């Protein structure tokens, strides 16, 4: 009897330690954890986001603040993302949210489910969006920043965070990079469109039409489209931004079209080589491309970024990349590199510490998948539809208004500005649990009891709310 009591106390103590020893951020999910959603892949695929938390409805496109309190108004996206606690954000409205200032996502344990918006979905415009928290899932949104407020910035930036996955989003019209994600751990950017950064706009340095800076540790970038950028398609981790994240990075099954002066480059690190896999990507030159067979330009020297440290070139594993118009580079990817010394060549694919992709395709297969299914594709707007056509045809439609040409633009007005998004009508959700009444009725749930969204009636791995959210877009992988 005494032995049984002692064992019980030991077990209770162990359980209390497991519960009470965590920090402020959500713990890193273990490899046996459930996928963030079916189709999630790569380093961030076990992100839990807002699973099991409260549901927050976005009911207005306004970004105004309450005049008496100075706080974001109820029902706004800003109010939803600035709340604390585990939560899932759903949308009862569609259209363009014109931000009045930079939007910071400073509290994690968050899922933003853009696929719930009725009509044509959501576009976020006017200012940068910056993720300053960990354990975040972002899906099916458009980030089209623009130049109307004369600010420098990325449409979306995520730096030095953990457990994040960004899926099926569209980014464009930034005045710096379209989307920069570096220094992150357990991270995925997948099935996104990154297009038409503004080349000669408001950036203090002048020409700055860049795709993105990407990197991290156990970081995956797959099935994305980069199109119509002058450079950084992408750039792998600046050496000075984070000297703790040296990879490995998986850059797999991406499509790059119409790069201008530079395609993919970078990779250098402080005192240690960064580890980068470039596998089965599809490169297609366009009218603005100056070096049509350049696959990658590994950085081996940098006068402004060593900061007193020894600069070490990145170690690249190149395999299966397809260079449109060049059989030589397609057959031997190193023929598309500006540097071919052993200093930049990995002897084998980097795998240690990396969550391997389960959805790898050949470059040619990925080309079709990305163009048909990536981006904010539940309801593609005219911008993404046009760009897909340009990639397929190897053409461009617009020049810039400040001297940029051949698909590289300088302002959203060069392409006709922001399209009007159909508002649609949100389905009735009586108990405000994020699941429409009609869907709850069809699945044997109670449309008058909000608690049933948090439980696992329909699937042992996903809450009932997640089953609904996942089902909306299950055909887009």
How would you label these PLM feature ranges?
Residues 124-129, 149-157, 173-181, 202-216, ...:
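Extracellular beta-strand/beta-solenoid scaffold signature
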Residues 235, 245-412:
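Extracellular beta-rich repeat passengers
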Residues 10-19:
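Bacterial N-terminal signal peptides
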Residues 412-477:
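Extracellular calcium-associated, cysteine-rich motifs in secreted modular proteins
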Residues 73-85, 97-111, 121-139, 145-162, ...:
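Extracellular beta-strand-rich solenoid/capping regions of secreted or surface-exposed proteins
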């Amino acid at each position: 009897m005494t032995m049984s009591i002692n064992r019980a106390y030991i077990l209770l103590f162990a359980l209390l330690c497991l519960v009470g020893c965590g920090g402020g951020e959500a713990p890193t999910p273990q490899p046996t954890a459930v996928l963030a959603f079916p189709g999630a892949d790569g380093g961030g695929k076990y992100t839990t986001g807002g699973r099991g938390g409260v549901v927050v409805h976005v009911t207005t496109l306004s970004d105004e603040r309450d005049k008496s309190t100075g706080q974001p108004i109820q029902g706004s996206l800003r109010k939803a993302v600035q709340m604390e606690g585990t939560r899932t954000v759903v949308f009862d409205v569609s259209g363009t949210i014109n931000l009045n200032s930079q939007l910071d996502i400073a509290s994690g344990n968050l899922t933003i489910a853009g696929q719930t918006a009725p009509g044509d979905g959501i576009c976020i415009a006017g200012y940068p969006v910056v993720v300053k928290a960990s354990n975040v899932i972002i899906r099916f949104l458009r980030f089209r920043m623009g130049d109307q407020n004369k600010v420098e910035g990325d449409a979306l930036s995520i730096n030095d965070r953990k457990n994040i996955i960004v899926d099926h989003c569209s980014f464009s019209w930034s005045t710096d990079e379209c989307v920069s994600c570096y220094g992150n751990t357990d991270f995925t950017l997948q099935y996104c469109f990154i297009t038409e950064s503004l080349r000669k706009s408001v950036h203090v340095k002048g020409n700055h039409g860049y795709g993105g800076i990407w990197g991290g540790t156990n970081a995956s970038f797959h099935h994305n489209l980069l199109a119509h950028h002058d450079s950084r398609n992408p750039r792998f981790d600046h050496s000075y931004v984070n000297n703790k994240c040296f990879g490995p990075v998986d850059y797999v099954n991406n499509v790059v079209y119409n790069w201008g002066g530079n395609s993919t480059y970078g990779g250098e690190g402080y005192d240690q080589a960064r580890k980068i896999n470039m596998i089965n990507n599809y490169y297609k030159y366009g009218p603005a491309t100056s070096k049509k067979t350049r696959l990658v330009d590994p950085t081996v020297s940098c006068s402004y970024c060593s900061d007193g440290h020894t600069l070490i070139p990145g170690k690249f594993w190149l395999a299966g990349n397809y260079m449109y118009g060049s059989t030589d580079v397609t057959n031997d990817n190193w023929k598309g590199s500006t540097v071919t010394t052993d200093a930049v060549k990995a002897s084998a694919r980097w795998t240690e510490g990396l969550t391997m992709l389960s959805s790898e395709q050949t470059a040619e297969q990925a080309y079709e998948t990305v163009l048909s299914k990536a981006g904010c594709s539940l309801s593609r707007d005219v911008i993404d539809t046009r760009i897909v056509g340009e990639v397929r045809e190897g053409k461009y439609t617009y020049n810039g208004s400040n001297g940029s040409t051949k698909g590289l633009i300088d302002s959203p007005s060069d392409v006709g500005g922001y399209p009007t998004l159909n508002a649609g009508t949100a389905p009735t959700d009586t108990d405000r649990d994020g699941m429409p009444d009609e869907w709850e009725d069809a699945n044997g749930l109670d449309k008058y009891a909000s608690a049933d969204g948090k439980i696992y009636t329909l699937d042992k791995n996903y809450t009932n709310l997640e089953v609904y959210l996942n089902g909306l877009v299950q055909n887009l992988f």
